[in-house]
Swiss-Prot record:
NCBIfam families: small_GTP
InterPro entries given in the database record: P-loop_NTPase (IPR027417), Rab (IPR050227), Small_GTP-bd (IPR005225), Small_GTPase (IPR001806)
A GO CC term attached to the entry: phagocytic vesicle
Localization of this protein: Cytoplasm; Golgi apparatus; Cytoplasmic vesicle, Phagosome; Cytoplasmic vesicle, Phagosome membrane
Name recorded for this polypeptide: Ras-related protein Rab-34
Keyword Nucleotidyltransferase: no
Any one Gene Ontology BP term: Golgi to plasma membrane protein transport
């Protein structure tokens, strides 16, 4: 029985969404990894379509984490929002290259007194979104500690990182240029992809979350292919012979499009 909501028409991805700035991107390919495209075409994505991928959103109080999520999930902006207590989450369903894919977006509290509660929900994240206010230099500096706290509960080598500057609508062009320079430096140090958004106007919000969904999906499919490949390599059949014991690795012939 399928208990997940159907995929909305505006959540269908047939192409790889592009990064905002090539100077700070997880990768700059124009298309999905060839192995991912091939696996989707041949329906070899394993359990990816049944999994729910966890994405946590962290950052200082009032940087706009909740507004960012609400703008994408509900297409709303509430100027009189209340600070998140502990954690909250939204579920978003996508279809990527014909495969269903779900993201669970965890909105965590930025207040110090709720930090210990929120941190218990960090574990198992496949992507971490660190949000700062483009008009507040201190909030950018604090992103380093937020990331460090989140990585205590996750494997740094297997999680995707995104550094997101919010409230772009409040920055003058000159102010933004200066802040972006610092933000790109921080993103490079973190090995994170940089984005700048406005939850008020909606600028870059949709594009950003589509990028998160696409890259998380891509990572999931590649991991699934790696696991299935390991299982085939490990499937060893022992053959008895008069002269010696021979070992033959039983493996299926790979499709021509997948190296």
């Amino acid at each position: 029985m399928n208990i997940l909501a159907p995929v909305r028409r505006d959540r269908v991805l047939a192409e790889l969404p592009q990064c905002l700035r090539k100077e700070a991107a997880l990768h700059v390919r124009k298309d999905f990894h060839p192995r991912v495209t091939c696996a989707c075409q041949e329906h070899r994505t394993g359990t990816v379509g049944f999994k729910i991928s966890k994405v946590i959103v962290v950052g200082d109080l009032s940087v706009g984490k909740t507004c960012l999520i609400n703008r994408f999930c509900k297409d709303t902006f509430d100027k009189n929002y209340k600070a998140t207590i502990g954690v909250d989450f939204e579920m978003e369903r996508f279809e990527v290259l014909g495969v269903p894919f779900s993201l669970q977006l965890w909105d965590t509290a930025g207040q110090e007194r709720f930090k210990c509660i929120a941190s218990t929900y960090y574990r198992g994240a496949q992507a971490i979104i660190i949000v700062f206010n483009l008009n507040d230099v201190a909030s950018l500096e604090h992103t380093k500690q937020w990331l460090a706290d989140a990585l205590k509960e996750n494997d740094p080598s297997s999680v995707l990182l995104f550094l997101v500057g919010s409230k772009k609508d409040l920055s003058t062009p000159a102010q933004y240029v200066l802040m972006e320079k610092d933000a790109l430096k921080v993103a490079h140090e973190m090995k994170a992809e940089y984005w700048a958004v406005s939850s008020l106007t909606g600028e870059n919000v949709r594009e950003f979350f589509f990028r998160v969904a696409a890259l998380t999906f891509e990572a999931n499919v590649l991991a699934e292919l790696e696991k299935s490949g390991s299982r085939r390599i490990g499937d060893v059949v022992r053959l008895n012979s008069d002269d010696s014991n021979l070992y033959l690795t039983a493996s299926k012939k790979k499709p021509a499009c997948c190296p």
